[in-house]
């Protein structure tokens, strides 16, 4: 894990804020690309809520969130380690990258709160001229994939099939042909709230206990479900931790 950067005065000018942004961005990109195996190892799902920090000197750090409330700076996404083993590695890294981009912008414009309108536009223009963390991660991924056109085509077909499988699993608590009978599954109850199955609502099934849940009850959206390889409901997740 990289060491934290020493505390320095908050940047005030457009140039200084952009320099701070660039250093933090470089650290985050390094964590998700060059140092990805080390970063992955630090994000143990059994640990407490962890965050990925990028520092102005280009270093990165996986650590617990700041204890002071409110924090001195906007905080990055909390608990990135919890989703690590429930998603494909590539999808999880992309999710972390998206949250990292959001955090970088929030920090930059936190520092730029006292800039005037023209200065904020110039700051955003400087930031926007650089690839996002997600784009940097995707470019590196595509560079590896393009080494073999045949392999790339195969992976695309496989990914499409997997996405279709997830969509089918999470759309309703039964997978049947055109003869799907909604009345047959009206007795399916949500494992959290006990509500009856409704075809107009998003549901997701637990791969461990095979119970079904409203997506809203377990805080899973259709978009998030597409990136989950094996879903474990809150009860199954907590029981695993208690045994350990």
From Swiss-Prot:
Protein name: PHD finger protein ALFIN-LIKE 2
Domain of life: Eukaryota
PANTHER family from the UniProt entry: CPG BINDING PROTEIN, PHD FINGER PROTEIN ALFIN-LIKE 2
Chain's role: Histone-binding component that specifically recognizes H3 tails trimethylated on 'Lys-4' (H3K4me3), which mark transcription start sites of virtually all active genes.
Xref: SMART domains: PHD (SM00249)
Domain notes: The PHD-type zinc finger mediates the binding to H3K4me3.
GO molecular function, one term: histone binding
Alphabetical list of InterPro entries matching this protein: Alfin (IPR045104), Alfin_N (IPR021998), PHD_AL_plant (IPR044104), Zinc_finger_PHD-type_CS (IPR019786), Znf_FYVE_PHD (IPR011011), Znf_PHD (IPR001965), Znf_PHD-finger (IPR019787), Znf_RING/FYVE/PHD (IPR013083)
Pfam families for the chain: Alfin, PHD
One GO term of the biological process aspect: regulation of DNA-templated transcription
Region (Disordered): 137-178
ZnF PHD-type: positions: 187-239
Feature type site, description Histone H3K4me3 binding: 197, 203, 207, 212
Subunit annotation: Interacts with H3K4me3 and to a lesser extent with H3K4me2.
Family: Belongs to the Alfin family.
GO cellular component: nucleus
UniProt source species: Oryza sativa subsp. indica (Rice)
């Amino acid at each position: 894990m990289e060491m934290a950067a020493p505390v320095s005065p908050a940047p005030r000018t457009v140039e200084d804020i952009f320099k701070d942004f660039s250093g933090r961005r470089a650290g985050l990109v390094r964590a998700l690309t060059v140092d990805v195996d080390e970063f992955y190892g630090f994000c143990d799902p059994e640990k407490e809520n962890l965050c990925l920090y990028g520092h102005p000197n280009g270093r990165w750090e996986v650590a617990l969130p700041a204890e002071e409330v409110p924090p001195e700076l906007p905080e990055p996404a909390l608990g990135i380690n919890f989703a690590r083993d429930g998603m494909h590695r590539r999808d999880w890294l992309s999710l972390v990258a998206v949250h990292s981009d959001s955090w970088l912008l929030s920090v930059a414009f936190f520092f730029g709160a006292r800039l005037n309108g023209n200065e904020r536009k110039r700051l955003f223009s400087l930031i926007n001229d650089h690839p996002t963390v997600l784009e940097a991660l995707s470019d590196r991924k595509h560079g590896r994939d393009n080494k073999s056109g045949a392999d790339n085509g195969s992976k695309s077909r496989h990914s499409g099939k997997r996405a279709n499988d997830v969509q089918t699993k999470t759309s309703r608590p039964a997978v049947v042909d055109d003869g799907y009978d909604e009345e047959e599954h009206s007795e399916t109850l949500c494992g959290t709230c006990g509500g009856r199955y409704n075809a107009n609502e998003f549901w997701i099934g637990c791969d461990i206990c095979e119970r079904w849940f409203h997506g809203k009850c377990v805080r899973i959206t259709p978009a998030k479900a597409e990136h989950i390889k094996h879903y474990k409901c809150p009860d199954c997740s907590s029981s695993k931790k208690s045994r350990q």
